[in-house]
């Protein structure tokens, strides 16, 4: 499985885009502003999107994506997956005919271009060549991370979170983990803000990574614009025993 980073920043500005990852050309993990880095032809290949939570930096691209590839979706609806809370938020606050048209009814209810699907944590789901699982994490709105496993390897994504046991305990129940994408939004001087907004800083992340029995390659994402150098320098001090580096936009990771 090819894992392409479309956006991984904690904000926008210049060439920075928010969270969106492309898996094997057809699947998105979150749909932030990074989706705009795809060509229209690439967008038309997308068949499914898995969401971690309902915050705008992770969903902002979805309404415009559906509109842009509307003609393509008339032959096969775009499948959107997420927790019950995330799906409800999208239906209630975005596709409500006020912020954006309800594409689950367009062109007709029986032949709509958009379909919402609720997933349950702890269940394994097959998506093309890989299996995936939603894992609850600790953020200010209901949020899940994901673990993907293909024939040749495995990857986990923490989504937005702070100190928790659920994510790390579940990963430890598996025999292996090759890659870990984990957020670290703020520097250590903002530790109280991290606790309030439920994000990681290097100190909190280092403490949680120590719970993990595996030694995956670690990629740091969701850094606040302008603070990247400080956060990564602090990560070098706080995270011991892991090969750790900053995730880059347009980076491709081969999990197979």
Predicted regions and their residues:
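Cap/insert and terminal regions of metallo-dependent hydrolase folds
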Residues: 164-254
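Conserved beta-strand hairpin/beta-sheet module of binuclear metal-dependent hydrolase folds
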Residues: 1-42, 144-162
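Active-site metal-binding loops of divalent metal-dependent hydrolases
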Residues: 8-9, 26, 31-33, 54, ...
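Metallo-beta-lactamase
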Residues: 85-143, 241-255
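Divalent metal-coordination and catalytic microenvironments
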Residues: 3, 21, 29-30, 53, ...
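Active-site metal-binding motif and surrounding structural segment of the metallo-beta-lactamase
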Residues: 35-82, 177-178
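Catalytic core of the metallo-beta-lactamase
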Residues: 117-175
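Structural motif
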Residues: 27, 48, 130, 153-155, ...
